[in-house]
From Swiss-Prot:
It is a peripheral membrane protein. This is Vacuolar protein-sorting-associated protein 46. It comes from Schizosaccharomyces pombe (strain 972 / ATCC 24843) (Fission yeast). The keyword Transcription regulation does not apply. Its main location: membrane.
Length: 200
């Protein structure tokens, strides 16, 4: 295993470990929130405040761990690109050397075999290039355009929108839209006098 590959393994392991720690902190945050609810229900405001502080701290801890995991994952993706492209370059160099020998001897069978390898190697390069372009375009939130992040958040919110709206309606008292009430009819003395005059 080369130094690059060893570093890549360590980075991937670190990112995975940090992600697990982030999930653990998020789970602990939810537990602290439940404690807050119970403390408030029992009327223990001071204890609820302590649990709330713990929940906020765990939330921030989870977020920081997730950010660091994302940054490491971004670096490992770039390192994966270097490892893969180096391997492809080495294979291409071997094919080129084989082609030089084939051309010098003008051995048609050897030339045909080398060309087969050459074309296959280019196919591998195209596949790897496509993969790397995709990976480099979306490896981490650090490099992701803000509008993409906003769009993803909106999509997730839309998917959970029904449940979220129901919860909001249950917990919040939203004033109903004001509907204008028709004004009470006001008698016009002059109009009434005219109507009576017409009838007589």
């Amino acid at each position: 295993m080369s130094n690059l590959e060893a570093s890549l393994f360590q980075l991937k392991f670190a990112a995975k470990s940090l992600n697990k720690q982030s999930l653990k902190a998020a789970k602990e945050e939810r537990a602290e929130r439940e404690k807050v609810k119970k403390a408030i229900t029992k009327g223990n405001s001071e204890i609820a405040r302590i649990y709330a502080s713990n929940a906020i701290r765990k939330q921030q801890e989870s977020l920081n761990l997730l950010k660091l995991s994302s940054r490491i994952d971004a670096v490992s993706s770039r390192l994966q690109t270097a490892v893969t492209m180096r391997a492809v370059s080495g294979n291409m160099a071997g094919v080129v050397r084989g082609m030089d020998r084939a051309m010098k001897t003008m051995n048609l069978e050897m030339i045909s075999q080398v060309m087969d390898k050459f074309e296959a190697q280019f196919d591998d390069v195209n596949v790897q290039t496509g993969y790397m372009n995709k990976a480099m375009g979306s490896v981490t939130a650090v490099d992701t355009p803000q509008e993409d992040v906003d769009l993803l958040m909106q999509t997730v919110a839309d998917e959970a929108g029904l449940e979220f709206n129901q919860n909001m309606n249950n917990n919040l008292s939203v004033p109903a839209a004001s509907v204008p009430t028709p004004a009470a009819p006001v008698e016009d003395d002059n109009l009434q006098e005219r109507l009576r005059a017409l009838r007589s």
